[in-house]
């Protein structure tokens, strides 16, 4: 786990920092909405053999570590945040075939049709629909024909959720996590994927239980949860933010979930 001072967002006050980086400051490693279970589901379906893998916005590098454990031919992380990029470099070791570039997912600078799998978690949700589509099209551009794009994001249910309810959820999320989160329904994620040039192969849905004890034990272990609780007790400003986030997640529990999708480039 990187030192707290090395975690992105530590230069911002607790009331303004993005929620996921506050959780990282507490020692939370898994910051994805569907937890390790969704990440493992994605990787088990998208990875295998001597393949070339790209990961968009690897963050703390937890999934990057899981990817390189599977010994792909190459791994390329793409992260706009230089602190995050440095953390991931520390995770993946000194293999010359495993690298991290400091770039944005909308314009990676990577060559056309050169990779077998792109992985992206908890980053499309934070974009407008226009920017979501731009990132998905960038994934399509760098993938070889038939390549896989594995994504793990926030979702809304049901598909016929009223627009005013969807807007209320988006506003509450933005206020609590200080990021302009725009989750989509399964139907909306599917339409966007198809517009970007993909077909949906498989879908996994689970609860958005990021801050619930059962999920935290599954993701962090008992010792990890104890460390997080200890740090929460010592940092009242962060504790207030975290409790606010959990309150929003619980308030909208009937409509917020986590989704994993395995997409294939047409």
Regions found by a protein language model. Name each.
Residues 133-148:
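A short glycine-rich, Lys/Arg-flanked "PGG" loop and its adjoining helix->strand segment in the class I
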Residues 50-59, 150-172:
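Conserved class I S-adenosyl-L-methionine
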Residues 32-50:
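Conserved alpha-helix/loop element of class I SAM-dependent methyltransferases that forms part
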Residues 202-266:
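Conserved Class I S-adenosyl-L-methionine
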Residues 60-107:
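Class I SAM-dependent methyltransferase SAM/SAH-binding core
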Residues 181-196:
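Short alpha-helix
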Residues 106-118:
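A short acidic, Gly/Pro-enriched loop at the edge of an enzyme's catalytic core
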């Amino acid at each position: 786990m990187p030192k707290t001072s090395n975690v992105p967002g530590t230069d911002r006050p607790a009331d303004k920092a993005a929620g996921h980086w506050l959780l990282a400051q507490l020692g939370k490693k898994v910051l994805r909405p569907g937890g390790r279970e969704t990440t493992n589901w994605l990787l088990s379906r998208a990875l295998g053999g001597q393949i070339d893998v790209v990961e968009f916005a690897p963050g703390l590098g937890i999934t990057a570590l899981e990817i390189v454990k599977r010994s792909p031919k190459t791994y390329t992380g793409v992260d706009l945040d230089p602190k995050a990029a440095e953390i991931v470099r520390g995770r993946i070791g000194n293999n010359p075939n495993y690298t991290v570039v400091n770039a944005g997912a909308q314009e990676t600078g990577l060559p056309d049709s050169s990779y077998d799998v792109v992985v992206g978690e908890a980053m499309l949700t934070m974009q407008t629909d226009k920017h979501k589509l731009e990132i998905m099209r960038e994934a399509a551009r760098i993938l070889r024909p038939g390549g896989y794009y594995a994504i793990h994001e926030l979702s809304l249910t049901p598909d016929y959720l009223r627009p005013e309810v969807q807007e209320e959820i988006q506003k509450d999320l933005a206020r609590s996590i200080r990021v302009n989160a725009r989750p989509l329904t399964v139907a909306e994620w599917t339409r966007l994927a198809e517009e970007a040039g993909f077909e949906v192969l498989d879908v996994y849905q689970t609860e958005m239980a990021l801050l619930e004890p059962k999920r935290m034990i599954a993701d962090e272990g008992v010792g990890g949860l104890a460390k997080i609780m200890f740090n929460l007790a010592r940092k009242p400003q962060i504790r207030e933010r975290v409790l606010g986030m959990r309150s929003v997640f619980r308030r909208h529990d009937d409509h917020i979930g986590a989704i994993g999708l395995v997409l294939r480039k047409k």
